[in-house]
Every structure is written in structure tokens, then in C-alpha cells.
Amino acid sequence: MKVLFTTDITEEPFTLTEIKEALKITGSAADDELERMITDARIYIEKAIDTSVTARTIQVTSLEKMEEWELPYGPTADLALTYGTDWEGALTYIYTYTGGVTTCPPEITRLITDYIKYKYDIDDEAIALPKSIKSQIQLLTRQP
């Protein structure tokens, strides 16, 4: 399965100022790193919960026929199915749809914020995710 974001999100679900406030950071020394962390955390959480935090156009090419709920980065809207062939001539299913919601739900914003706090506070990448973050991910993961 190949996933292509044909139009990606235009802005993150929250601002640098909001993250700095949540982390109780003053000054601008860490601004560049925090900006990167916002994007990295959003991408990580989107993959973990299989949900797009804001609406964007997605194209999925698959050798298998898929149900709407199986498509990544849902929820899905405006689904269109076309057919193609791969380089070996096999039939492919090409799904184009809007994935995600118009506004990032507050519980997902909180999860992303908690993840950024965790990443900002650790010095060792080998430390496992806290149970509280794992639990939130489990609760927010899209179900069939």
C-alpha cells in the first residue's frame, strides 16, 4: 500500500506559543527545536492512532480492495475509487479522499502536547513511553 498526501495540512493543530505555555518555557532559545517537535509529535501521534488531526487530501494505492474504515489517516470523506495497474500489470485500487476532521479534537491536541512534554523532558531516547501516553493512544486509535 502506498500513501500519498496530495494536499497536506497547512498549519499545526496548535502554535509555538501554546506549546511554550504548556511547557512553561519563556524566551526564544528553544523555539526552533520546539517547532520541529510540534511537527514530529503530530506525525508520530497520527501514525499511532491512524487518524489525521486536520483535513487533507490523501491518495492510497493498493493491490487489495479496501473498505472505507481500512484506509489510513481517517476518518474519510469524499471517497473516490479509480483503478490502475502497477509496473507488472496487476490491477491496483486508487482511493482518493479527504482524511481527518476540520478541527483537531481537544483530546488529540492534549495527547500531542503530552507527547511533546515527554520528548522535551527526556535526555535518553531509550526511555519507554509513559503508560499515560500509551493509554491515551490506545483509547484514541481508530477502530473498525
Regions picked out by a protein language model, each given a short descriptive name:
Residues M1-P144:
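Divalent metal-cofactor coordination and adjacent catalytic microenvironments
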